[in-house]
Structures are given as C-alpha cells and as structure tokens.
Amino acid sequence: MKPGKLNWEDLKELIDENRGFQREEVVLHSGIGEDCAVINFGDYDCVISTDPITGAGKNIGKLAVNINCNDIASSGVEPIGIMVTILAPEGTTLEEIKALMQEIGEEAARLNIEVMGGHTEVTSAVNKMIVSCTIIGKGKAGTSVATSGAKVGDDIVVTKFMALEGTSIIVNDHEQKVQEFLTEAEIIEAKGFTDYLSVLEEGKLAGELGVNSMHDITEGGLLGALWEMAKASQVGFRVFEEKIPIKEVTKKICSSFNLDPLKLISSGSMLITMQQGERLVKALQQKGINAAVIGKITEGSGILVKEGVEQEVPPPQRDELFNL
C-alpha cells in the first residue's frame, strides 16, 4: 500500500465491521468524517479524538498538539488535556526526546491544556520520530457540533487560508529545494504559517453562533474535508475555486511541485456550514480571522466550479504531501 490515509471504502469497512459493543453513553459514534467521539457524563459531554504526525520531519511537537486540539475545536468545545505517545527510532538521543517534549509542553501551555500522560519508547519499528496524541475536551451536554450536521441550503465557510500546514511542512523539510524559486521573504512567511495552525478561536466562536457542522481541514485538504463532511451528512456541495482563499506563496510552491493546494494538508483552517454564513464571516473578521463563503450545501454530488467548468469531486486519496 502507498503512504497516506486509507481510502474511504476500506476505512468505512474497517469501522463498520469492528465497532465492538456500542455503549449508550457514547452519543456520537465513529464514522467517515467524524474525528471525535462524544461521551455523555450527565450535565457534561467528554469529547475525545486522536491523531498522529507522520508526514512532517520538523515542528512535529507543535503540529501534534495543534492538530489534535483542532479536532476538539471542530466540535465547538474546550480542550482540557492531551496524552502523548512518542515512538523514536534507534539512535535517537535523550536530548532529542527532551527537545520534542519541551516543544509539546510549550505549545500545550500556550493553548491552556495539560499534558496528562502518555508513553515514550525507542523502537526499531520506526525509522523516524512518530508522535501520536489523544486529546480530551469538555462541553455542556448536547452542545457539541458534529461533522454530520450539514444541511441543504447551508453556506459553506472556510477560515484563514488553505494549505497553511502543507506549505509550512514543505518549506521546513525541503528548504534547499524551495530556495530555487522562493525569495527569502517568502520562505520566512511560509515558515511562519506554523503560528496559525490552531482553530480553537474560530471553533469556539462558531459553536456559540450555533453552526450546523464543522470539520477541521487536515489530510486530503479542502476537497477531502468537503467530501467527508458531505458523506457524513448525506448531502452534496457546490464550491467555487475563485472564492477559496489561498496565499500566493502556497500557489507558487504548489505550482513548482505540481501539487493541488485544494488537496494539500490544511490544519489551521476550519470548514463550517450554517445558514447566513456571512454573519459568521463578519464575526470572525472582527476578531482578525480571515474567512470566506465559498459555496453552498446542496443535494446530489459534490461539485467544484473551476473557471466556469463544473468538476465532480471524487473521494479523497492520499494527501498531496506524499506526492513530493
């Protein structure tokens, strides 16, 4: 098999055939596009998610904390703590592990969450450092937002700019290559995108405004996230390429490496659906967060309108990052 997430058909089969015993306390179960599980504990819900970092070589501690917190943010609740598993290859020094944990601890402190535990080992089973985290959030019972809540007629809103994470990974891990076509200022700008990977603020605001659906845009990029949201909600969508916010340095990098920015890992951006999406856009912009309405939730299939031509969006394959 090639690197990357399993295709949706294989993943759905694995999920559907291996659910174990379904507990009544679990109010949001596993499914395509659902990154979180929700467990009811009376007046409050516990929201849990887990994700590894596998495609990056640098800033993996910072990335691991943010992508997991973003899953919780997409439910519109507050992250409380994180558990960290580190698998280090043979030859890793104690100083390298300490530096990684320091990065994780500093990012967790910045986001007001606690590192509650985990596991660390050196193993021949991996050839580079792997970090996998489980994040726990808390919200009032019945208030969490699901990926599967999108409704026909909803506006589709995205926050910040697409492929911030993918752009920063490429520049940090392949700096010598990008120096051939990027200026020093562009390289500094792209590296700085790691400071914009959290979607906690927009997730909290969107939850307060009563949106129908949220999904953080990660592996597979915007088109992958749209497809997953539509599949989970049993709806279609129609989005317009010219309305999708993408930084010029990202366009330049993707053009040079022949990558599609709409299929490139995009932590730092949230996909949201609701009625009167411009109301959310205005509220986000008042807090200094870029946002745009890029289309509508529809019946039928998912459509990308590109230069006036309609293209049906297929199920997501592996992320463009793995095509480098």
Residue ranges of each PLM-predicted region?
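Acidic, Ser/Thr/Pro-rich beta/coil linker or hinge segments at domain junctions
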Residues: P3-D10, Q285-L324
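General beta-strand structural signal in soluble alpha/beta enzymes
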Residues: L28-G31, V47-S49, E114-G118, V157-T159, ...
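Small-aliphatic-rich amphipathic alpha-helix that forms the alpha element of a beta-alpha
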Residues: G57-I82, Q102-R110, S198-E208, G224-E228
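Active-site-proximal betaalpha loop/short-helix elements
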Residues: P89-G91, A190-S266
